[in-house]
Amino acid sequence: MKVVRTLVMTVMVGWPGIAGAQSLLVPMDRTQHNHLKAYGLTYWTLEQYSGAEWLLNYRGGSFLLPDMEGVRRQAALRGITIEPVSAADLAQIRAVIADANMETVVLEKAPNVAIYTPPNSTPWDDAVTMALEYAEIPYETIWDDAVLDGKLE
């Protein structure tokens, strides 16, 4: 019985994902299959769960999201590469960031996004709206009247 218990513990510690990740790393380096959608996943996570981290200069500016079933589901649906991160992995990531030209930015809530564009434009008329549409990041459009009338907040 003691041998079985030791074997189970060894497998759980040695196999990432079984012991349970605390966070999900969304890499933004060449391992990421869908960079724009990854930004959208981070935005969605901030809307749903409020809280994420942007790891500046770490693997292309990766994101650290909470390991929630909804986040995993959205990543799978959107074709986004994610990596489970254990507490030990997270400590190692933080050590790498502390020792290099890197920084962690805490993201607390999803921002309001507005695009300055003519009212009759379509999303494919410019790169910004097309990128936001593809990433599934909600935005409002504003044009001259809103600016001149002082309707911006």
Region roles according to the model:
Residues 1-5:
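Positively charged n-region of N-terminal signal peptides that target proteins for export
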Residues 81-110:
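Non-catalytic propeptide/linker segments at domain boundaries
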Residues 71-83:
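Short amphipathic alpha-helices in soluble, non-transmembrane regions
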Residues 37-74:
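N-terminal, post-signal-peptide region of Sec/Tat-exported proteins
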Residues 23-24, 29, 33, 64-73, ...:
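Helical hinge/lid and interdomain linker segments adjacent to catalytic or ligand-binding clefts
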